[in-house]
A protein has these predicted regions:
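Beta-strand elements of well-folded, non-transmembrane domains
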Residues: 12-14, 61-65, 77-81
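Intrinsic disorder/low-complexity segments enriched in polar/charged and small flexible residues
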Residues: 21, 56-58, 89
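A generic structural signal for well-ordered alpha-helical segments enriched in polar/charged residues
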Residues: 31, 35, 116-119
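C-terminal/domain-edge helix-coil "capping" segments
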Residues: 1, 82-122
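Short, low-complexity, polar/charged sequence segments that are solvent-exposed and flexible
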Residues: 26-31, 76-78, 94
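An acidic-aromatic pocket/loop used at catalytic or ligand-binding sites
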Residues: 67-87
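A structural "domain/chain start" motif
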Residues: 1-27, 31
C-alpha cells in the first residue's frame, strides 16, 4: 500500500507547557514526508482509495505537582473508506507511547517518536 498524499494533523491536548514545539514538529514531519516522496495533500478527509493519509500527531499530557510531564502520545498514519455507507478508519502505521518526563516536556520525545514511525514506513 503506497501513500501518495498526506497532511500533518496536530492534536494538542497537553497542558502546563508539556508540548510547546508544535511548529517544529509539523515542519519536521512534513520534511520526513517529502524525504519519503509523499506529496503534501489538500483534502478535508483522506480517502483510502486515493492513497491519502493524515499523519496524526497527538499529545495528551499534563504537568504533575512534582513538575514532571506525564501523559501519552500517538503518532499514526490514518485514512478512511466507506463500505455500504459505513465509514471505517484505516491505520497504516502507529506508535502509541506513554511517558513520565522529569522536569521537562514532550518536545524532543515527540520528535523521536515521529522519527521511529518514519523508520517503519517503506
Amino acid at each position: 500500500m503506497k501513500i501518495t498524499k498526506s497532511m500533518v494533523y496536530l492534536q494538542d491536548n497537553a497542558t502546563g507547557g508539556c508540548w510547546t514545539n508544535l511548529k517544529e514538529t509539523r515542519e519536521y514531519a512534513e520534511d520526513k514526508l517529502r524525504m519519503k516522496n509523499i506529496q503534501q495533500g489538500d483534502f478535508d478527509v483522506p480517502e483510502f482509495v486515493n492513497n491519502e493519509f493524515w499523519l496524526w500527531i497527538e499529545v495528551r499530557a499534563a504537568r504533575t505537582v512534582a513538575g514532571n510531564c506525564s501523559g501519552l502520545m500517538n503518532v499514526r498514519l490514518i485514512s478512511f473508506t466507506t463500505i455500504n455507507g459505513q465509514w471505517y478508519t484505516i491505520v497504516r502505521n502507529s506508535k502509541l507511547t506513554s511517558a513520565l518526563i522529569p522536569s521537562n516536556n514532550f518536545n524532543n520525545y515527540t520528535l523521536d517518536v515521529v522519527k521511529e514511525l518514519f523508520n517503519e514506513i517503506k
